[in-house]
Regions:
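A mature extracytoplasmic/lumenal domain signature
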Residues: 95-97, 118, 128
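Beta-strand-rich domain onsets/edges
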Residues: 7-75, 80-87, 97-99, 138-152
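Glycine-centered loop-to-beta-strand initiation motif
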Residues: 106-116, 120
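Short, aromatic- and glycine-rich surface loops/edge beta-strands on solvent-exposed regions
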Residues: 1, 121-131
Length: 152
């Protein structure tokens, strides 16, 4: 349970721990499954207009900016859960070269503005958890949205 608790704390999901205990779920020997929802924003040579869009993944980060033509040093993302913005979710931004991690939370519409003032490679991620498939013995399912891009 200690490993599960640390994971929940790191991902901003302590409410899941409270729910786990409230339901008297077992402390050990339970299953948690996960779903990865990953995308990369890549500029194709000769293309100048990169536009991200919702592709239909269960949990998805959608950028309203083109990282290759960033006009200011901030970029807005929306975290979408099953077609609608989801609020109060931890979004972490990792910068590869600087070896930094910055944390943000989505607003009620699932939107968050992140700082992108340093050129380099970025990874943005967010995690959302739901009840698992009890008929398969899974107590929880975590959905991992991630996006990578480069700021030139």
């Amino acid at each position: 349970m200690e490993k599960f608790e640390k994971f929940l704390e790191r991902e901003g999901l302590l409410h899941i721990l409270a729910e786990h205990r409230k339901r008297n779920f077992p402390e050990q020997g339970f299953k948690e499954t996960y779903v990865r929802c990953a995308k990369s924003l890549v500029q194709v040579k000769g293309e100048s207009a990169l536009k991200d869009h919702f592709s239909g993944m269960p949990l998805e980060l959608v950028a309203s900016f083109n990282p290759y033509q960033l006009e200011n040093k901030d970029g807005e993302l929306q975290l979408i859960w099953r077609g609608s913005g989801i609020g109060d979710i931890l979004v972490r931004v990792f910068h590869k070269q600087q070896k930094t991690e910055t944390e943000y939370f989505t607003n009620k519409q699932g939107k968050v503005t992140i700082n992108l003032d340093v050129p380099g490679d970025y990874l943005v991620n967010a995690v959302h958890m739901t009840e698992g498939a009890f008929n398969r013995g899974e107590l929880w399912t975590s959905y991992w949205a991630s996006m990578t891009f480069q700021i030139p």
